[in-house]
């Protein structure tokens, strides 16, 4: 059967918060079956646990940020959540010493390295998937996202930037995880921003940790990073990386096709909320025989 997964052992890393510019320590701890993903703020007078769920995503201006009813925040979670989804991790406690997850290199690859180093272990409880049975869509002024029934996991995304750096590359990408590898084709795509946005954020006390080491920065015409892009279409691949992380906030892998145009964290979260508010549109699924699961999920990294 397809079982739930956690890490074999704890592992830590230190990085910089994208917005605060402060050093942040991150520690990933194994957790029992059915725990889900829980963030723990250890920098507060009393540690506070924040379980990942769509209803707690209450700030999506610059990232997916969890905010509790007492105002405790955990921000910039989407790249780490994307790595958990790509590695098939169900249960984990994430200790963090600040209000945001470190940005690392702006992609999910450093987080995947942490997971690989710690190793994964199956747990004696069936993994629960969410199977989409009916299409669900959210639309707002030309921006849209939708989930459709699909026997696997597939993402089709398009972006639209009238800018020379974007016009040189495809702005639409489809990735069917029955045939494509998250690790090789998505995890290394970095976040991106425009020089004028960076200046605006810094003037407003944000983006203090941002640099060419953890983001693709674009001026009026060119990519400023001396090494260039990791993929010709790295921009839209990063949007796929983000979407995978945003969707995993639902707490289970989705058996569905996700598509979107100019989508971002806010729309991805609205889509999850609409799905959960439409009980006839989805069901839980588990698999006694791994071969009965869609082939998209046969490629999860093996246990070491």
Swiss-Prot record:
<dbReference type="InterPro" id="IPR011334">
    <property type="entry name" value="UDP-acyl_GlcNac_deAcase_C"/>
</dbReference>
<keyword id="KW-0443">Lipid metabolism</keyword>
<dbReference type="GO" id="GO:0103117">
    <property type="term" value="F:UDP-3-O-acyl-N-acetylglucosamine deacetylase activity"/>
</dbReference>
<protein>
    <recommendedName>
        <fullName>UDP-3-O-acyl-N-acetylglucosamine deacetylase</fullName>
        <ecNumber>3.5.1.108</ecNumber>
    </recommendedName>
</protein>
<feature type="binding site">
    <location>
        <position position="79"/>
    </location>
    <ligand>
        <name>Zn(2+)</name>
    </ligand>
</feature>
<dbReference type="Pfam" id="PF03331">
    <property type="entry name" value="LpxC"/>
</dbReference>
<keyword id="KW-0441">Lipid A biosynthesis</keyword>
<keyword id="KW-0444">Lipid biosynthesis</keyword>
<keyword id="KW-0378">Hydrolase</keyword>
<dbReference type="InterPro" id="IPR020568">
    <property type="entry name" value="Ribosomal_Su5_D2-typ_SF"/>
</dbReference>
<comment type="function">
    <text>Catalyzes the hydrolysis of UDP-3-O-myristoyl-N-acetylglucosamine to form UDP-3-O-myristoylglucosamine and acetate, the committed step in lipid A biosynthesis.</text>
</comment>
<feature type="active site" description="Proton donor">
    <location>
        <position position="265"/>
    </location>
</feature>
<dbReference type="InterPro" id="IPR015870">
    <property type="entry name" value="UDP-acyl_N-AcGlcN_deAcase_N"/>
</dbReference>
<dbReference type="GO" id="GO:0046872">
    <property type="term" value="F:metal ion binding"/>
</dbReference>
<feature type="binding site">
    <location>
        <position position="238"/>
    </location>
    <ligand>
        <name>Zn(2+)</name>
    </ligand>
</feature>
<comment type="similarity">
    <text>Belongs to the LpxC family.</text>
</comment>
<keyword id="KW-0862">Zinc</keyword>
<comment type="pathway">
    <text>Glycolipid biosynthesis; lipid IV(A) biosynthesis; lipid IV(A) from (3R)-3-hydroxytetradecanoyl-[acyl-carrier-protein] and UDP-N-acetyl-alpha-D-glucosamine: step 2/6.</text>
</comment>
<dbReference type="GO" id="GO:0009245">
    <property type="term" value="P:lipid A biosynthetic process"/>
</dbReference>
<dbReference type="GO" id="GO:0016020">
    <property type="term" value="C:membrane"/>
</dbReference>
<feature type="binding site">
    <location>
        <position position="242"/>
    </location>
    <ligand>
        <name>Zn(2+)</name>
    </ligand>
</feature>
<dbReference type="InterPro" id="IPR004463">
    <property type="entry name" value="UDP-acyl_GlcNac_deAcase"/>
</dbReference>
<keyword id="KW-0479">Metal-binding</keyword>
